[in-house]
Amino acid sequence: MTSLNTNVEHRRTRTTISQIIHDMTPENKFYITVADGGSKRFRNKPNDQSRHSGQYQPRNLSGKTNISTQSQFTPRLYGKQYNYNQPNRLQTRSVRPNYYSGYRYNNRTGNQEFYPMQPFNNQSFNNQSRTHQSKTYQHNQQKRSFNGPRNNGPQNNVPRFFQREETN
């Protein structure tokens, strides 16, 4: 083991109590530096070097601002739980891939919030994440439905002899 580097001289360590007390007097005080074994996982700044560089955001994005409803009981589909847009010094992918890019009416790229449930009343439904991207994917009942004709008017999807006859 190398000797302790004191301000007075380089000498072999004599570990007697009187020697330690002598070294801790202010004129010959020595300084011991301990190697930093602090874990790099638990830093206060965002963890932008790991692969999973999402910073946890426990905010309640459901729009129901109820004090008793804590954010841990908020369902997962109302907003992002992690922020995947951290800068990444390693060249790994720091943005979660867009799982909903194949749908119709969705021409946006990047992270999507996605509301898979249809509301009972489409007119009074407003998207909760107005600030992020206003309407990502939603069946618009005013547009044509996905398969088949419009669902108002005559029954176009039944054979012709089942349709109502016009009264002359």
From Swiss-Prot:
It comes from the Viruses. Residues 37-74, 81-100, 117-168 are annotated as: Disordered. Residues 120-129 have a biased composition (Low complexity). Residues 52-74, 82-95, 130-158 have a biased composition (Polar residues). This is Uncharacterized protein R297. It comes from Acanthamoeba polyphaga mimivirus.
